């Protein structure tokens, strides 16, 4: 049985003070809760304060991105060992906003995924198609390419730990979410691709999230699907009560 995982992606929101306020309130709301795995991914500047506050809780800490090198002259970048030093368990890799605004390619994403595993981090690997690709019936082609190239050369024992977030680009931050059954169909496709690359056992172990305008009102529609194991939540994760309503749903 795959344990459900709900992750908050705060994107470029929240100062250190706002992070502290959120986490203190959320810890109180979620005290004693163990059913689903909870991950909070604040901006880099808030990782230290979040790490201190989450230390003795079951809530996991994640980062929103990383570079693939251990260290070096890469101005503005953050390395995997820096994230491990801050007690991060997860790191989001390949988010569509990174692909879109910062021209991240499948090859770069593959390097980041390999590096994350090398340094003991678990990637939340994002895939998803654009609206025009969906309209042209290219969803399967796009997802297949992203998954195959993103996971190329990875060991089976690492792949089975990965979390894959299906985030249709047209649903992110737009208020338009995919229908539960459509998201479930793509999640099933992802498992099929993984089983072809590795085997059925691996494809059944990986956890697949849905992301894209998830909120307390529609979360149950996604979590009730048999191929979907959680959610990567954007805007609705910025308020403690809203995020808690999603987690406990």
Swiss-Prot record:
Q: Which residues form the active site?
A: 95, 167
Gene Ontology molecular function, alphabetical? triose-phosphate isomerase activity
Report the catalytic activity. D-glyceraldehyde 3-phosphate = dihydroxyacetone phosphate
Say yes or no: keyword Aminoacyl-tRNA synthetase present.
no
The alphabetical list of record keywords is: Cytoplasm, Gluconeogenesis, Glycolysis, Isomerase
Q: What is this protein called?
A: Triosephosphate isomerase
The family note in this entry says: Belongs to the triosephosphate isomerase family.
Please describe the quaternary structure of this protein: Homodimer.
Binding sites annotated in the UniProt record for substrate: 9-11, 173, 213, 234-235
Q: GO BP, one example?
A: glyceraldehyde-3-phosphate biosynthetic process
Main location as per UniProt: cytoplasm
Q: Which residues form a coiled coil?
A: none
The organism named in the record is Dictyoglomus thermophilum (strain ATCC 35947 / DSM 3960 / H-6-12)
- EC number(s): the record gives 5.3.1.1
Please name the top-level EC class of this enzyme: isomerase
Q: In which pathway does it act?
A: Carbohydrate biosynthesis; gluconeogenesis; Carbohydrate degradation; glycolysis; D-glyceraldehyde 3-phosphate from glycerone phosphate: step 1/1
Q: Where in the cell is it found?
A: Cytoplasm
One annotated Gene Ontology cellular component of this protein: cytosol
Taxonomic lineage: Bacteria, Pseudomonadati, Dictyoglomota, Dictyoglomia, Dictyoglomales
Q: Does the keyword Cytoplasm apply?
A: yes
Job of this protein: Involved in the gluconeogenesis. Catalyzes stereospecifically the conversion of dihydroxyacetone phosphate (DHAP) to D-glyceraldehyde-3-phosphate (G3P).
């Amino acid at each position: 049985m795959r344990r459900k995982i709900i992750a908050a992606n705060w994107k470029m929101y929240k100062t250190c003070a706002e992070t502290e306020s959120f986490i203190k309130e959320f810890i109180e709301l979620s005290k004693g809760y163990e059913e689903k795995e909870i991950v909070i991914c604040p901006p880099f500047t808030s990782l230290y304060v979040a790490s201190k506050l989450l230390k003795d809780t079951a809530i996991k800490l994640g980062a929103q991105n990383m570079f693939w090198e251990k260290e070096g002259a890469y101005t503005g970048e953050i390395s995997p060992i820096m994230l491990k030093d801050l007690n991060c368990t997860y790191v989001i890799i390949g988010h569509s906003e990174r692909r879109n605004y910062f021209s991240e390619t499948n090859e770069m994403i593959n390097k980041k995924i390999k590096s994350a595993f090398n340094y003991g981090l678990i990637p939340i690997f994002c895939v998803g198609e654009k609206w025009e690709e969906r309209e042209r019936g290219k969803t399967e082609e796009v997802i297949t390419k992203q998954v195959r190239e993103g996971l190329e050369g990875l060991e089976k024992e690492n792949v089975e730990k990965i979390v894959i977030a299906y985030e249709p680009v047209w649903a992110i931050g737009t208020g338009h979410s995919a229908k539960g059954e459509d998201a479930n169909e793509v999640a099933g496709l992802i498992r099929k691709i993984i089983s072809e690359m590795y085997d059925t056992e691996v494809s059944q172990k990986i956890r697949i999230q849905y992301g894209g305008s998830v909120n307390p009102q529609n979360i149950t529609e996604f979590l009730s699907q048999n191929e979907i194991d959680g959610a990567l939540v954007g805007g609705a994760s910025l308020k403690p009560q809203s995020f808690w309503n999603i987690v406990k749903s």
